[in-house]
């Protein structure tokens, strides 16, 4: 809980819970004959929990050349999708990087699919950044997603601002997440 006050102003209060780490998980990397790549995350889901993930890549080429970044959206990756087994998944941002977000309605198995069209030759490595989100962070990310995905906002037919705040006597959000990073998977 965070409480801030000043003389002559109402006291502002916000609450969140820092979540524990992402549950123990296994990861499986796959590549089909069409060049579609996928990473399947299997974990023991916890009731009332919220999760997120993104994929980091690293291509170590000849002469020490290294090409690295996150798999969504970057030039050279033209397709990323998520398996339909995730309940209400959204794609939004944490620290300026796209992240897939889902809640505990997923069945303990989550699949991220992507196509790698980079021309770079070399050793390709992928790893997961896995997030366990507080309920406030999950609600904040969903609100941002709703605002960013609102086709009517640009037409002036609805408010372009997101509508979630967990600040009493104020506006904004106070939320938390924990992050785990998997080992590199080599193609």
Give a label for each model feature.
Residues 1-187:
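A sequence/structural signal for flexible, mid-protein segments enriched
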